[in-house]
């Protein structure tokens, strides 16, 4: 069975665990509608993605 040669220092252990934190999702303001949306996702109100109409406009 594989065994580590040296004890992992608290600093190195902390650096490894730094990626485990839960991060807040990023939002950007849409240029056309001004609504907040996730980056690289389409705007559900307008149905636009990268300047193209992908979905039909949502009727409210």
Curated annotation (Swiss-Prot):
GO-annotated cellular components: cytosolic large ribosomal subunit
Coiled coil regions, renumbered to chain: none
GO molecular function, one term: structural constituent of ribosome
Bias (Basic residues): 1-16
Stretches for region Disordered: 1-60
Basic and acidic residues bias: start-end ranges: 17-44
Residues annotated as signal peptide: none
InterPro entries for this protein: Ribosomal_bL32, Ribosomal_bL32_bact, Ribosomal_zn-bd
GO biological process per UniProt: translation
Keywords: Ribonucleoprotein, Ribosomal protein
Family, per entry: Belongs to the bacterial ribosomal protein bL32 family.
Name of protein: Large ribosomal subunit protein bL32
Natural source organism: Bradyrhizobium diazoefficiens (strain JCM 10833 / BCRC 13528 / IAM 13628 / NBRC 14792 / USDA 110)
Gene encoding the protein: rpmF
């Amino acid at each position: 069975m594989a065994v580590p040669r040296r004890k992992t220092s608290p600093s190195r252990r902390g650096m490894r665990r730094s990626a485990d934190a839960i991060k807040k999702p990023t939002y950007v303001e849409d240029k056309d509608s001004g609504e907040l949306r996730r980056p690289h996702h389409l705007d559900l109100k307008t149905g636009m993605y990268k300047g193209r109409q992908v979905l039909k406009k949502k009727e409210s």
